[in-house]
């Protein structure tokens, strides 16, 4: 044993176990090759060429079926590439009469439409519950909710911005019902 072999043995880099695994791989390769009948006197290249020729003739003898071309009826459209249609730019005015009307407000926001909520003549407790629900819906949809006047609010879906201070605009026009 040479000096290098002793060092490799100490570091466990030259283990006899590795040799056993190498030998097992050698036998595994032989078992796979024995599955195919072969002539030991033939060269590998000729054997491979013959096997590919046999496989191609097997493919040729089977009846060929034409692949059926199917097209998907669903076309994915990303929101950023979608062009806004006039119906998407619609502003809906809803005058709720009970808390159940909040579902209509949320569905309208889900459809990407702006909602003006007119709660004039509604009980203050019911109006507060509707505003709380609408505020949660707008927040969940990354939208916005702003007060226009005492009992009129505007809720917008994601992608629709409200610019300016609507309350100050309403005060400047001195419209009835716009003051606190």
UniProtKB/Swiss-Prot annotation:
GO CC, alphabetical: cytoplasm
Main location: cytoplasm
Composition skew (Acidic residues), residue ranges: 15-35
InterPro entries reported in the protein's UniProt record: Cell_div_SepF (IPR023052), Cell_div_SepF/SepF-rel (IPR007561), SepF-like_sf (IPR038594)
One family name in Pfam for this protein: SepF
GO biological process, one term: division septum assembly
Protein family per UniProt: Belongs to the SepF family.
Function per UniProt: Cell division protein that is part of the divisome complex and is recruited early to the Z-ring. Probably stimulates Z-ring formation, perhaps through the cross-linking of FtsZ protofilaments. Its function overlaps with FtsA.
HAMAP family per the UniProt record, alphabetical: SepF
Name of the protein this chain belongs to: Cell division protein SepF
Gene that encodes it: sepF
């Amino acid at each position: 044993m040479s000096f290098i072999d002793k060092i490799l043995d100490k570091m466990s880099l030259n283990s006899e176990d590795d040799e056993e695994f190498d030998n097992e791989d050698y036998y595994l390769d032989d078992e796979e090759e024995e599955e195919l009948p072969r002539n030991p006197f033939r060269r590998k290249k000729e054997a491979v060429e013959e096997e590919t020729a046999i496989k191609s003739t097997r493919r040729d003898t089977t009846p060929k079926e034409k692949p059926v071309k199917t097209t998907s009826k669903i076309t994915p459209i990303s929101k950023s590439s979608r062009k806004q249609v006039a119906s998407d730019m619609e502003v809906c005015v809803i005058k709720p009469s009970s808390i159940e009307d909040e579902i209509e407000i949320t569905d309208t926001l889900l459809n990407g439409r702006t909602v003006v909520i007119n709660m004039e003549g509604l009980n203050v407790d019911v109006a507060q519950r509707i505003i709380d629900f609408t505020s949660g819906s707008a927040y969940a949809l990354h939208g916005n909710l702003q007060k226009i006047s005492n009992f009129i609010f505007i809720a917008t879906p994601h992608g629709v911005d409200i610019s300016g201070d609507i309350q100050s605009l309403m005060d400047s026009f001195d419209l009835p019902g716009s003051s606190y």
